[in-house]
A protein has these predicted regions:
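Conserved N-terminal phosphate-binding loop of PLP-dependent enzymes in the Aspartate aminotransferase
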Residues: 1-211
Length: 211
Protein backbone atom coordinates (compact mmCIF):
# COMPACT_ATOMS: atom_id res chain seq x y z
CA UNK A 1 0.00 0.00 0.00
CA UNK A 2 1.18 3.52 -0.73
CA UNK A 3 -0.16 4.76 2.60
CA UNK A 4 -0.33 3.15 6.02
CA UNK A 5 -2.56 4.43 8.81
CA UNK A 6 -1.00 2.84 11.89
CA UNK A 7 1.63 0.39 13.05
CA UNK A 8 0.80 -1.13 16.45
CA UNK A 9 3.31 -3.27 18.32
CA UNK A 10 4.15 -4.56 21.78
CA UNK A 11 7.83 -4.07 22.70
CA UNK A 12 7.62 -7.53 24.26
CA UNK A 13 4.81 -9.79 23.07
CA UNK A 14 2.76 -10.66 26.15
CA UNK A 15 0.11 -13.27 25.40
CA UNK A 16 2.18 -14.16 22.34
CA UNK A 17 4.68 -15.87 24.64
CA UNK A 18 6.83 -13.15 26.24
CA UNK A 19 8.84 -12.69 23.07
CA UNK A 20 11.13 -9.63 22.91
CA UNK A 21 11.09 -8.03 19.48
CA UNK A 22 14.10 -8.93 17.30
CA UNK A 23 16.86 -6.35 17.46
CA UNK A 24 16.13 -3.48 15.09
CA UNK A 25 12.82 -4.89 13.84
CA UNK A 26 10.53 -2.27 15.38
CA UNK A 27 12.88 0.57 14.47
CA UNK A 28 13.01 -0.43 10.81
CA UNK A 29 9.27 -1.09 10.68
CA UNK A 30 8.57 2.36 12.15
CA UNK A 31 10.82 3.98 9.54
CA UNK A 32 8.84 2.30 6.73
CA UNK A 33 5.50 3.21 8.30
CA UNK A 34 6.50 6.84 8.78
CA UNK A 35 7.69 7.02 5.18
CA UNK A 36 4.25 5.79 4.11
CA UNK A 37 2.49 8.46 6.17
CA UNK A 38 1.51 6.26 9.10
CA UNK A 39 1.70 6.55 12.88
CA UNK A 40 3.38 4.32 15.44
CA UNK A 41 1.48 3.09 18.50
CA UNK A 42 3.38 1.33 21.26
CA UNK A 43 1.16 -1.02 23.26
CA UNK A 44 2.47 -0.65 26.83
CA UNK A 45 -0.43 -2.42 28.55
CA UNK A 46 1.93 -5.13 29.80
CA UNK A 47 5.37 -3.54 29.46
CA UNK A 48 4.69 -0.11 30.92
CA UNK A 49 5.33 1.41 34.35
CA UNK A 50 8.74 -0.10 35.03
CA UNK A 51 7.98 -3.78 34.57
CA UNK A 52 10.91 -4.31 32.15
CA UNK A 53 13.24 -3.25 34.97
CA UNK A 54 15.83 -1.59 32.78
CA UNK A 55 13.35 1.03 31.55
CA UNK A 56 10.05 2.54 32.59
CA UNK A 57 8.51 2.00 29.15
CA UNK A 58 9.06 -0.80 26.69
CA UNK A 59 9.56 1.57 23.77
CA UNK A 60 12.53 3.09 25.63
CA UNK A 61 14.30 -0.27 25.42
CA UNK A 62 13.95 -0.10 21.65
CA UNK A 63 15.02 3.51 21.31
CA UNK A 64 11.80 4.42 19.50
CA UNK A 65 9.47 7.40 19.89
CA UNK A 66 5.82 6.44 19.43
CA UNK A 67 3.09 8.82 18.34
CA UNK A 68 0.57 7.05 20.57
CA UNK A 69 0.99 4.96 23.73
CA UNK A 70 -1.73 2.71 25.15
CA UNK A 71 -1.50 1.70 28.81
CA UNK A 72 -3.56 -0.17 31.40
CA UNK A 73 -3.38 -3.07 33.90
CA UNK A 74 -0.58 -2.18 36.34
CA UNK A 75 -1.51 1.46 35.86
CA UNK A 76 -4.38 0.83 38.30
CA UNK A 77 -2.85 -2.09 40.25
CA UNK A 78 -6.11 -4.03 39.99
CA UNK A 79 -8.42 -1.02 39.73
CA UNK A 80 -9.97 -0.74 36.24
CA UNK A 81 -7.97 2.01 34.65
CA UNK A 82 -6.53 2.60 31.20
CA UNK A 83 -5.23 5.55 29.25
CA UNK A 84 -3.98 6.64 25.85
CA UNK A 85 -1.22 9.22 25.48
CA UNK A 86 -0.38 10.85 22.19
CA UNK A 87 1.75 13.50 20.59
CA UNK A 88 0.44 17.04 20.29
CA UNK A 89 0.11 16.60 16.52
CA UNK A 90 -2.17 13.57 16.92
CA UNK A 91 -4.17 15.26 19.68
CA UNK A 92 -4.74 18.31 17.48
CA UNK A 93 -6.26 16.08 14.81
CA UNK A 94 -8.78 14.78 17.34
CA UNK A 95 -9.70 18.18 18.74
CA UNK A 96 -12.35 19.06 16.10
CA UNK A 97 -13.95 15.60 16.40
CA UNK A 98 -16.64 14.48 18.82
CA UNK A 99 -14.99 12.02 21.19
CA UNK A 100 -16.14 11.04 24.66
CA UNK A 101 -15.92 8.29 27.25
CA UNK A 102 -18.78 7.60 29.64
CA UNK A 103 -16.44 6.76 32.50
CA UNK A 104 -13.44 8.74 31.32
CA UNK A 105 -11.76 10.80 34.01
CA UNK A 106 -13.53 8.97 36.83
CA UNK A 107 -12.16 10.66 39.99
CA UNK A 108 -11.79 7.41 41.93
CA UNK A 109 -9.83 5.83 39.07
CA UNK A 110 -7.67 8.94 38.78
CA UNK A 111 -6.90 8.82 42.52
CA UNK A 112 -5.97 5.14 42.27
CA UNK A 113 -3.71 5.77 39.29
CA UNK A 114 -1.99 8.67 41.00
CA UNK A 115 -1.24 6.56 44.08
CA UNK A 116 0.11 3.72 41.93
CA UNK A 117 2.56 6.10 40.26
CA UNK A 118 3.62 7.37 43.68
CA UNK A 119 4.21 3.86 45.04
CA UNK A 120 6.22 2.83 41.96
CA UNK A 121 8.55 5.78 42.58
CA UNK A 122 8.61 5.78 46.40
CA UNK A 123 9.24 2.04 46.70
CA UNK A 124 11.64 1.89 43.75
CA UNK A 125 9.62 -0.86 42.11
CA UNK A 126 11.29 -0.49 38.72
CA UNK A 127 14.65 -1.40 40.25
CA UNK A 128 13.01 -4.20 42.21
CA UNK A 129 11.56 -5.52 38.97
CA UNK A 130 15.04 -5.61 37.47
CA UNK A 131 16.63 -7.25 40.51
CA UNK A 132 13.95 -9.92 40.94
CA UNK A 133 13.88 -10.48 37.19
CA UNK A 134 17.64 -11.08 37.10
CA UNK A 135 17.21 -13.51 40.00
CA UNK A 136 14.41 -15.33 38.17
CA UNK A 137 16.37 -15.57 34.92
CA UNK A 138 19.45 -16.93 36.68
CA UNK A 139 17.46 -19.63 38.46
CA UNK A 140 15.39 -20.54 35.42
CA UNK A 141 18.47 -20.87 33.22
CA UNK A 142 19.95 -23.21 35.82
CA UNK A 143 16.81 -25.32 35.56
CA UNK A 144 17.06 -25.16 31.77
CA UNK A 145 20.53 -26.72 31.92
CA UNK A 146 19.04 -29.67 33.83
CA UNK A 147 15.81 -30.26 31.94
CA UNK A 148 15.64 -30.76 28.17
CA UNK A 149 11.94 -29.93 28.20
CA UNK A 150 12.75 -26.26 28.77
CA UNK A 151 13.31 -24.98 25.26
CA UNK A 152 13.90 -21.32 26.04
CA UNK A 153 14.02 -18.83 28.89
CA UNK A 154 13.58 -15.22 27.82
CA UNK A 155 12.50 -11.80 28.95
CA UNK A 156 13.57 -8.86 31.05
CA UNK A 157 12.59 -7.60 34.48
CA UNK A 158 9.37 -9.25 35.63
CA UNK A 159 8.28 -10.22 32.13
CA UNK A 160 9.65 -13.71 31.66
CA UNK A 161 8.65 -16.55 29.37
CA UNK A 162 9.59 -20.21 29.75
CA UNK A 163 8.91 -22.17 26.58
CA UNK A 164 8.30 -25.89 27.03
CA UNK A 165 9.20 -28.34 24.26
CA UNK A 166 9.43 -32.09 23.77
CA UNK A 167 13.21 -32.22 23.89
CA UNK A 168 15.51 -29.25 23.38
CA UNK A 169 18.25 -31.37 21.76
CA UNK A 170 16.09 -33.62 19.61
CA UNK A 171 12.63 -32.16 19.00
CA UNK A 172 11.71 -28.50 19.44
CA UNK A 173 8.03 -29.15 18.84
CA UNK A 174 5.79 -27.80 21.61
CA UNK A 175 5.44 -29.96 24.69
CA UNK A 176 2.43 -32.25 24.61
CA UNK A 177 -0.58 -30.20 25.65
CA UNK A 178 -1.68 -32.73 28.28
CA UNK A 179 1.75 -32.74 29.92
CA UNK A 180 1.95 -28.95 29.86
CA UNK A 181 -1.51 -28.68 31.42
CA UNK A 182 -0.50 -31.16 34.12
CA UNK A 183 2.56 -29.09 35.06
CA UNK A 184 0.50 -25.91 34.88
CA UNK A 185 -2.04 -27.30 37.36
CA UNK A 186 0.50 -28.88 39.71
CA UNK A 187 2.32 -25.60 40.24
CA UNK A 188 -0.79 -24.37 42.04
CA UNK A 189 -0.15 -26.99 44.74
CA UNK A 190 3.06 -25.09 45.51
CA UNK A 191 1.31 -21.75 45.68
CA UNK A 192 2.59 -20.68 42.26
CA UNK A 193 0.34 -19.05 39.70
CA UNK A 194 1.58 -18.78 36.12
CA UNK A 195 -0.05 -17.43 33.03
CA UNK A 196 0.30 -19.30 29.77
CA UNK A 197 0.61 -18.15 26.21
CA UNK A 198 2.50 -18.46 22.98
CA UNK A 199 1.25 -19.51 19.58
CA UNK A 200 0.92 -23.11 20.74
CA UNK A 201 0.03 -22.40 24.36
CA UNK A 202 3.30 -23.91 25.61
CA UNK A 203 4.88 -20.91 27.31
CA UNK A 204 4.72 -20.19 31.02
CA UNK A 205 4.23 -16.46 31.50
CA UNK A 206 5.89 -15.18 34.66
CA UNK A 207 4.65 -11.67 35.44
CA UNK A 208 4.30 -11.36 39.23
CA UNK A 209 3.56 -8.17 41.17
CA UNK A 210 6.46 -5.72 40.94
CA UNK A 211 6.61 -5.38 44.72
Amino acid sequence: ASRVSLFLAEPIMGVGGLCPQPCGFINEAVDHVKAAGGLYLSDEVQTGFGRPGSHYWGFEMLGTKPDIVSMAKQQGNGFPLAAVAMSKEVANCLAPKLTFSTYGGNPVAMAAGREVLKVIDDENLQQNSKDRGDQFLKGLNELKSKYKQIGDVRGTGLMIGVEMVKNRDENLDPMDATMFADIFEKTKDYGILFGKGGRYGNVFRIQPPMC
